[in-house]
Amino acid sequence: MLDRLKSIEERYEKLNELLSDPEVVNDPKKLREYSKEQSDIQETVDVYRQYRDASEQLADAKAMLEEKLDAEMRDMVKEEISELQKETETLSERLKVLLIPKDPNDDKNVIMEIRGAAGGEEAALFAGNLYRMYSRYAELQGWKTEVMEANVTGTGGYKEIIFMITGSGAYSKLKYENGAHRVQRVPETESGGRIHTSTATVACLPEAEEVEVDIHEKDIRVDTFASSGPGGQSVNTTMSAVRLTHLPTGVVVSCQDEKSQIKNKEKAMKVLRARIYDKFQQEAQAEYDQTRKSAVGSGDRSERIRTYNFPQNRVTDHRIGLTIQKLDQILEGKLDEVVEALIVEDQASKLQQSEG
């Protein structure tokens, strides 16, 4: 571990030199690339230096015990050794976590897709609750939410809603939302007061850059049609809605949220690029999962990950056995407690795998 940390520190010093080089300063692409690389290893280098300093102080304190000391001084040195041992152990554990390979998608924006599944209209209404929850969470994080496509039902729910959340580290926190979300509550339309169970599925895709997914125009079929509102009625006589089909993979994306066909095509391309990138990622992950499986779940979108129980104001995350009696707050976007618990569990799992 120490050899690896030393080489990371050497790379950090080299990046300092490169970022002062006039040739790099005048090259925006290289400047951005090196700045990001340095930012990514900054915390690791800082903690390593703290660890090294504490280790040196610990060695010096232990050496002092070999000298002739009076009883009071000896007790002081022993106390210092005890504190420094705790500090080095804490820093060592932090370094182990920092050395876990980082998900290359963590810093990206995220495209989220929510679909009402089992439960008909009640599932569509629950999809709306989830969309609002994620929108509020994004707002609390200082992120921006933009709807890409929405299929609204007559009662104001969503058969499907696709939206992008833009902000630093958005994917790193929301990627754990992949899967089936279950709701237990009494529907407003239910006169008998019986609790119904419905589900909605959530997919989280990292936004893909053009350089990451090479899509050729010849591989895309573009269809245009008149956009429609709730219930299917036409709301636009112009052919502004766009459907893109990526012929090699069969991935299809529609967008009719904007009045302009050009803007709809731009939005659809973002979703198409993310879905194709995600398809490749899923295939690579499937190979990896044959040998190892994460403790916080496989990321399989059919996997039931969480239950929202309205009568008991309870949320349960089944992957880590977390139960919180704060459903009302969570639906208002206060997801930090859940997200942080999932991150900690994921890091612990990866650490165990790397040590195994």
Swiss-Prot record:
GO terms for cellular component: cytoplasm. Keywords: Cytoplasm, Methylation, Protein biosynthesis. One of its GO terms (molecular function) is translation release factor activity, codon specific. It is found in: Cytoplasm. SMART domains: PCRF. The modification N5-methylglutamine is found at Q233. SUPFAM superfamilies: Release factor. Pfam families: PCRF, RF-1. It comes from the Bacteria. Methylated by PrmC. Methylation increases the termination efficiency of RF1. Peptide chain release factor 1 directs the termination of translation in response to the peptide chain termination codons UAG and UAA. Belongs to the prokaryotic/mitochondrial release factor family. This is Peptide chain release factor 1. The lineage of its organism: Bacteria, Bacillati, Bacillota, Bacilli, Bacillales. The gene is prfA.
